[in-house]
A protein has these predicted regions:
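Phosphate-binding site of ATP-dependent enzymes
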Residues: 155-232, 255-262
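ATP-binding N-terminal substructure of ATP-dependent carboxylate-amine bond-forming enzymes
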Residues: 1-89, 93-95, 99, 118-126
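Anion (oxyanion) recognition and catalysis
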Residues: 31, 77, 105, 132-134, ...
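Active-site nucleotide/adenylate-binding loops and adjacent lid/helix of ATP-dependent enzymes
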Residues: 1-9, 37, 52, 93-181
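A short, polar/charged loop-to-alpha-helix boundary motif
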Residues: 203-207, 272-281
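Conserved metal-phosphate-binding beta-hairpin within the catalytic cores
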Residues: 176, 185, 241-274, 282
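Hydrophobic alpha-helical membrane-association signature
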Residues: 22, 233-236
Length: 284
């Protein structure tokens, strides 16, 4: 009897299109390998589809809010069907950038300096705090989005216009900007899968650089690092994976500057599209 796998993809987050693409790519590969596959949305029909299809496992192909923040994982725990990727608590910890950065700092993993901003300071006080704690330029980002959605590099001149775009989030992370090389490392289970370097033509590896085929981001694999540096990179990625208590696959995003690796964040639901990095690392 063929094993049945239900892929849940789409959803209502800003990464819906990426999730749909991930679901299609995963379904294609699973069918090639002899599995009986069905794709569904996490909507009002989800529970009845699950009940009728009776999958052996659910492949979580959702990205962003409600897909990698512990929400869908909670539902899957309640209905008692095994599912892929990280569980409820680990997903929530990884998705909340402020919580995950606190865990990194506590465990001596280097991460850019930051503070949480809740839109309750005057312009003058905010500028003063940034100058004192971080210095310009800075990176501003929602604490609970993925795929670099609404992430901006800001100078003193444009920070307030960019913050206005994020006001609906209520709180955002203001983070020290680290120049240098963009390197991402993948872990699967307890295995160090590998790493890839990115050279975007844009200012940084944002949403467009990730998913627009015309953005022409250069992917470099193998990464040009000394053996000791490469081993250090993969050790940090595995340490972060374990600290957040992840399972399955994760991708950790780093900046490499002045001989040091700065961990930006860990992703528990890395994309599996034709432009995604983990499949490229795995295929190498």
């Amino acid at each position: 009897m063929k094993k049945k796998i239900l892929i849940v993809s789409g959803g209502i987050s800003k990464e819906r299109i990426i999730s749909i693409d991930t679901g299609k790519q995963v379904a294609k590969e699973l069918r090639k390998n002899g599995y009986l596959v069905k794709i569904c949305e996490p909507d009002k029909n989800f529970l009845s589809i699950t009940k009728n299809f009776k999958p052996h496992i659910i492949f979580n192909a959702l990205h962003g809010q409600f897909g990698e923040d512990g929400y869908i994982q909670s539902i899957l725990e309640i209905i008692g069907i095994p599912y892929t990727h990280s569980g409820v608590i680990s997903s929530a910890k990884a998705m909340d950038k402020e919580i995950s950065k606190r865990i990194f700092k506590k465990n001596k993993i280097l991460t850019p300096k930051y503070f949480l901003y809740t839109f309750n300071k005057t312009d003058k006080k905010l500028i003063s705090e940034i100058n004192k704690k971080l210095g310009f330029p800075v990176v501003i980002k929602p604490i609970n989005e993925g795929s670099s959605v609404n992430v901006f590099i800001c100078t003193r001149r444009n920070i307030f216009s960019k913050l206005k775009l994020l006001k609906d989030y209520k709180k955002v992370l203001i983070e020290q900007f680290i120049p240098g090389r963009e390197i991402q490392a993948a872990i699967i289970g307890k295995k160090k899968l590998g790493a890839i370097e990115l050279k975007p033509k844009r200012k940084f590896y944002d949403y467009q650089a990730k998913y627009n085929s015309k953005a022409k981001t250069e992917h470099i694999i193998p990464v040009d690092l000394k053996k000791n540096d490469y081993n250090k990179l993969m050790d940090i990625a595995l340490k972060a994976h374990r600290l957040i208590e992840c399972r399955g696959v994760t991708r950790s995003d780093f900046k490499f500057y002045n001989g040091k690796f700065y961990l930006l964040e860990i992703n528990t639901q890395p994309g599996m599209t034709s432009l995604s990095l983990v499949p490229e690392i795995a295929a190498y």
